[in-house]
Each structure stands twice: as C-alpha cells, then as structure tokens.
Amino acid sequence: MNNPYEKALDGLSIEDPVKSFFDWCIDRENIRVKREKGIPAPWTDDPIFQKGRFLNTFREDDRGSKAVQRFCAPLKDSLPDLVHALFFARWCNKDTTLDLLDPSILKQTKNLKEFLLNSVSQPWCSAVYPVVSMHWEGKVYERFEACTDLLPALIDFLVKCIKASDGNVVTATNMINSTFGMSNDFPIFMAVIGISWFDPET
C-alpha cells in the first residue's frame, strides 16, 4: 500500500517536539470545531492542514468511532450484548455499514452474512487498520467468518476476560489475544476500550 505521507517528515528538524505536538493538537481541534459549526473552508491559514488529511485530535470525533457509538448505544445496558456489538463494530469498522445495521441482527448469523454481502456497499469493512486472522479451538478464522460465525460463541469468554482484567484494558487485551493469537491486537484493544463510553466502571 502506498503511503503518501511516508517521507513527509524527512529532513525536518523540530526544536521542541512536545510543544509542536500539542500545538498541532490545538490547531487540529480548532479545525474540527469550525467544520462542525458549518464555517466554510479553509478553517486554517496553515497550508499543510489545508492540503493534507489528518486524524482528529480525539478518536471519538472520527466518523468511524461515532458510528460505533451509535451502533452500540442501544445495547449499553447489557454487558454481553454490548461486548458483542463492540467487537463486531471494530471488526467491521466502516461507518456506512454500521449506520445501516440494526444491532439485533448480530445474533442472526445467516441474515447478518447475507446483509453484509448483499445489502451494503462493498467492501463491507474498512482497511483503516488491519484485522488479521484469529485462532479459536484449533481453527483459524478470517475477518468475515470471525465476526459473523464465530463471535456469538465468544461472548462468554470475552466478558470473562474483561471482568477478570479489573478495568485494565491492556490486561484484558492480552488475556483475549493469548487465545486469539492475532499478530495485531489493535482491534481487540479498540473493542475493549469502547466499553468505557457506555460503562466506565467495567
């Protein structure tokens, strides 16, 4: 995959990286606020911000995270159902798909698979971060099968790990991935930390 920003900082000398980082955060957040108020572009005089695409300062302001919140909110009063929705949402991670799905379909595996393959624009999932294959009971599951066929059977295991972690997202992620064996555990981390949006005490 070609990364247009791969060499963007080559040769750049930053005198105070910490100050520069927080200045960037402030500038980027100001852009988001102006956009949300409907102020027309450009939202900054900085030519780099005008020409480039950048993440929001706060992840919860990203379109994908907002879609995850909307999708999971109806299930916030049931930890098992919330965990199911969060793990599916992070395996999918595509706002346009999540916005079309009713979370009640997660327990209807056949209907869910049919919907993902035939009722949403393809691809049904996002490649913003890799969701690699995972292991369960001696079998390897790729992304689609993992979040449709397998996920309903994993809920008790996931909830048990999350409760046993005593509120530590890194501990929960490591406990889960010690079984899943994923070479990139970021989707697990994102699903687990999403619980705090709805139930900060878990």
Task: Please provide the spans of the model-predicted regions.
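Helix-hairpin-helix/helix-loop-helix acidic hairpins
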Residues: 119-181
